[in-house]
C-alpha cells in the first residue's frame, strides 16, 4: 500500500462512524487485513471497510464504468426516468467487485454503483494452470472455471504468459481489475447483454473459491489467494 493510500485510509478511519460489528472491528484495529474478512466469512455492509483495508480501489484507474442505461417507468404521475449504471472496482491484485446503481442523475447512479461494487468485492484464486506455461506465477486462473447469469455462460481457461485476455471488452476490464493478465475464454448465450455478461465473468472468478486445492496443486500451479504480495496494512 503506497503512502498516499495509507493517508487516505487514515482520513476515512478518523471520520467514519461504523454501524456494523465488522465495521467496529475494523475501526478498532482488530481486523487490519481484508483477507481475514473473507477467511472468517464476514459480510461487508459498509463501503468504508473497503476504503480502509483496500483504499487503492478508489484510484481512477481501478474503477470502470461498464454500462450506462436510461430506464423509463410509467407511474400515476407520468413517466419516471432514471439512470442505471454498472460499475466494477478492483486492486488489480486478487480483489474485484461489481455493482449496479440507480439514480435520477447519472453522477448519483455512478457513485451508488461504485459503492455497491465495494460491498460486493470478492477475493479470488490466481495461478498458472496452463500446460503451455507452468511458470507458477499468478497471471491467470489456476484451473478452468465457469460462470452463469441468465442465458450467458462464460468459461475462463488458463492461458500462457503473453497471451493476453481472449474475451470481450467488458470481460477484459473486469479481469484486469482482478489481476488476471492471460486467459482463454468460451462464451454462450446473449453476450451482448452487458449486465449478464459482466455478472457471468464475475461469477466465474468467484467460483475459483469453490475449488478445493491441495498443497500439491498450490505448489504445481503457484496458486495465491487474494494479493500475490501481501502489503503492509499498518496505518501508523
From Swiss-Prot:
Pfam families from the UniProt entry: Ribosomal_S5, Ribosomal_S5_C
Gene3D superfamilies: 3.30.160.20, 3.30.230.10
GO cellular component terms listed in the entry, alphabetical order: cytosolic small ribosomal subunit
UniProtKB keywords: Ribonucleoprotein, Ribosomal protein, RNA-binding, rRNA-binding
GO molecular function: rRNA binding; structural constituent of ribosome
Domain of life (superkingdom): Archaea
GO biological process assignments: translation
PROSITE patterns: RIBOSOMAL_S5 (PS00585), S5_DSRBD (PS50881)
The S5 DRBM domain, residue ranges: 61-124
Subunit structure as annotated in this protein's UniProt entry: Part of the 30S ribosomal subunit. Contacts protein S4.
Comment on protein domains: The N-terminal domain interacts with the head of the 30S subunit; the C-terminal domain interacts with the body and contacts protein S4. The interaction surface between S4 and S5 is involved in control of translational fidelity.
Similarity section: Belongs to the universal ribosomal protein uS5 family.
Classification via HAMAP family: Ribosomal_uS5_A
Function: With S4 and S12 plays an important role in translational accuracy.
Protein name: Small ribosomal subunit protein uS5
Organism classification: Archaea, Methanobacteriati, Methanobacteriota, Thermococci, Thermococcales
